[in-house]
UniProtKB/Swiss-Prot annotation:
Residues 1-54, 539-588 are annotated as: Required for 28S ribosomal RNA processing. PANTHER family: PESCADILLO - RELATED, PESCADILLO HOMOLOG. This is Pescadillo homolog. The keyword Hydrolase does not apply. It comes from Homo sapiens (Human). The gene is PES1.
């Protein structure tokens, strides 16, 4: 006995989803406004498990949303603002058509606006949630900040993105929060640690833009509108944590300039914005009352495991503090041909001082003739006169030193020298993975060991000698092993023949002197271990054995891939050596 019979597609998963057109009509919005609202609110389409049931038996391609998400959008106050804006555009078009200029001005003054503050608070209840979602916001804002002022994007949006990204970079410099840098084909990847949260973003290279035609800039502009609001909130909170003025104010401004601009901040004028964007000056801090020294925490005795963890944590913190002061006490000068903003940002983030030619950009703090300069970053060999006591290195030295957490030897980065490979700091090799020789050398440097590099000529000679020596030694060893095996077999045959002869003659067997055979304990232990492993596999259930075989197959595949990479590297090194030999043998 049941209730009333329900029609098909009126219960179950069919009632949990709604098509995009139905949702749009329910909200009374155009497709562009509906898409914009979904981006701002974080609503995205869902793919039903049984699409045919949800689509009422049809197999046509449709976009589905959860019905509860659309009901959630019904109460959004921005929807009314979208409708008001639609009416505003209609009235403005009508006023332009009738040439009623007073009406046009009045309508523009009363243009409907909306804020996204409540959406930010709704989507990110805590500040940590906002930091975890900051990667895409930073990448998009850095991209828009490099756009030219064309009709594709609003100029105000480009300027806002530039201001917010400069503010964030100044916070990273002040907090010494930068951890990793990587130069890729797409751009420069940065990783910073803010309040314990790793944040990774990418900035494009400073090349001229050619806007592609297959990109929907309206969708990107909607995302940027949301991300700029989010980044503004985050910057304000981060500046408060460090007691910095927000909007940022340059440190050491002249009193006359400060009085003339009383009540205004650094970003209110274009010249101050350029000085901030130079990243060469520090920010002014809010004067706070001196706080009492914190009381030292009593240390209580703990067990061995806890003390080992605390010791590891202490060492890690010490290494991190040392990493933050990597370039402290060093003065850099940047030549015209190097990427100024990226290098200035990285050097300042690790405590170094940086400057450039005054004619290149505003914000230079010292000239190239300064005798205190320790490193000059160049990318064109033989263009300047060398100064004694100054290292002329290529830009990659700065990036590699940051990733290595130490100042690398400058010999491999001199001007005109072929640079070593730029290793990614985001790759961590596991057991069985291929580790390139450069990474092994870097790990040895981090441990404080001497990599023991030899000159290439010495390496080649040693390899040739080793190859010849190895061939001779292998031949001698094989001959010795064969002789030993043949001798032992002959001795055994002679002993057995003597015993058989004694038995036939009826004599009592007598003890004969033999040779002492020493057992290889290591080999016996390996045999026992392999036997125990084989027995354990035999005792496994069918499902466990299948899982074990899959794990072992994955390990073997990883080893094969590592061996393949090692062979490729070996072939590459041999090709480089042969090319160098050919160059040496070629008559000039």
């Amino acid at each position: 006995m049941g209730g009333l019979e329900k029609k098909k597609y009126e219960r179950g998963s069919a009632t949990n989803y709604i098509t995009r057109n139905k949702a749009r009509k329910k909200l009374q919005l155009s497709l562009a406004d509906f898409r914009r609202l979904c981006i701002l609110k974080g609503i995205y389409p869902h793919e039903p498990k049984h699409k045919k049931k949800v689509n009422k038996g049809s197999t046509a391609a449709r976009t589905f949303y959860l019905i509860k998400d659309i009901r959630f959008l019904l109460h959004e106050p921005i929807v009314n603002k979208f409708r008001e804006y639609k009416v505003f555009v209609r009235k403005l078009r009508k006023a332009y058509g009738k040439s009623e200029w007073n009406t046009v001005e009045r309508l523009k003054d009363n243009k409907p606006n909306y804020k996204l503050d409540h959406i930010i608070k709704e989507r990110y209840p805590t500040f940590i949630d906002a930091l975890r979602d900051l990667d895409d916001a930073l990448s998009m804002c850095f991209l828009f900040s490099t756009f030219p002022r064309t009709g594709k994007c609003h100029v105000q949006t480009i300027q806002l993105c530039r201001r917010l990204t400069v503010e964030f970079m100044h916070y990273i410099i002040a907090a010494r929060a930068l951890r990793k840098v990587f130069l890729s084909i797409k751009g420069i990847y940065y990783q910073a640690e803010v309040l314990g949260q790793p944040i990774v973003w990418i900035t494009p290279y400073a090349f001229s833009h050619d806007h592609p035609t297959d990109v929907d800039y309206r969708v990107m502009a909607t995302f940027t509108e949301f991300y700029t609001t989010l980044l503004g909130f985050v910057n304000f909170r981060l500046y408060q944590l460090l007691n910095l003025h927000y909007p940022p104010k340059l440190e050491g401004q002249a009193q006359a300039e400060a009085k003339a601009g009383e009540g205004t901040y650094a970003l209110d004028s274009e010249s101050c914005m350029e000085k901030l964007a130079a990243l060469s000056a520090s920010l002014a801090r809010v004067v706070v009352p001196a706080t009492e020294e914190e009381a030292e925490v009593d240390e209580f005795p703990t067990d061995g495991e806890m003390s080992a963890q605390e010791e590891d944590r202490r060492k890690e913190l010490e290494a991190q503090e040392k990493h933050k002061k990597l370039f402290e006490g060093l003065k850099f000068f940047l030549n015209r041909e190097v990427p100024r903003e990226a290098l200035a940002f990285i050097i300042r983030s690790f405590g170094g001082e940086v400057s450039w030619d005054k004619s290149l950009c505003i914000g230079a703090t010292y000239d190239v003739t300064d005798s205190r300069i320790t490193h000059q970053i160049v990318d064109r060999p033989g263009q300047q006169t060398s100064v004694i006591g100054r290292c002329y290195v290529q830009p990659q030295w700065v990036f590699d030193s940051v990733n290595a957490r130490l100042l690398l030897p400058v010999a491999e980065y001199f001007s005109g020298v072929q640079l070593p490979p730029h290793l990614s700091p985001f790759v961590t090799e596991k057991e069985g993975d291929y580790v390139p020789p450069e990474k092994l050398k870097l790990l040895a440097l981090q441990r404080g060991e001497d990599p023991g590099n030899l000159n290439e000529s010495e390496e080649e000679e040693e390899e040739d000698d080793n190859n010849e020596g190895d061939g001779d030694e292998e031949g001698e060893n094989e001959e010795e092993e064969e002789d030993a095996e043949a001798g032992s077999e002959k001795e055994e045959e002679a002993r057995l023949a003597a015993l058989e002869e004694q038995r036939m003659e009826g004599k009592k067997p007598r003890v004969m002197a033999g040779t002492l055979k020493l057992e290889d304990k290591q080999r016996l232990a390996q045999e026992e271990e392999s036997e125990a492993k084989r027995l354990a596999i035999m005792m496994m259930k069918k499902r466990e054995k299948y899982l074990y075989q899959k794990i072992m197959f994955g390990k073997r595949r990883k080893i094969r891939e590592a061996n393949k990479l090692a062979e490729k590297r070996k072939a590459h090194d041999e090709a480089v050596r042969s090319e160098k030999k050919a160059k040496k043998a070629r008559p000039e």
